[in-house]
Amino acid sequence: MGLLHDIGRRVGIVNIPKHVYEGYRYSTDQGWDEVARICMTHSYPLMKEEFCYEPITEEERCIKEYILQCEEDDYDKLIQICDALATDYGFVILEKRFVDVTRRYGIMETYIKGWDITFQNKEYFEQIMGCSIYDVLPDIGRTTLLCPSPWKPPVKNEYWHP
């Protein structure tokens, strides 16, 4: 299930709420309720606290309504931490991933609090594992030290049509 958490990206290069909503919608249409849940929860480590504002778009309203009815469980936390450790070029330490996301989307008011929750979740799973999460991720030292430019969508031309 966790591998499908970003299935909303199937609609293209879109912002966080759009890919969350589209993943939820697609998974629901397929009858994949557990995948739909992960599509909704993986980008919101603060869960209910994430929505201390009134959303503008219909997609954001739907996400808020879902999250407010949702009780976070360990699987939600696990997918959130896995998502926070992965880039398109491999596993990285959390700080590297946080900078990567911030460079692409900008800083949002709730990011720092979300980072704190992510570190708490990391420590929670490390307690269960009896070791650092970083100890079990292949090549994390090498990929953390890579410095690729932030990912940008390809430029459309006569040969490429999304």
Where are the regions a protein language model picked out?
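Divalent metal-dependent catalytic cores for phosphoryl transfer on phosphate-bearing substrates
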Residues: 1-101
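Divalent-cation-assisted or electrostatically stabilized phosphate/pyrophosphate-binding catalytic cores
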Residues: 22-25, 92-124
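Charged phosphate-binding loop/patch that engages nucleotide di/tri-phosphates or the phosphate backbone
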Residues: 107-162
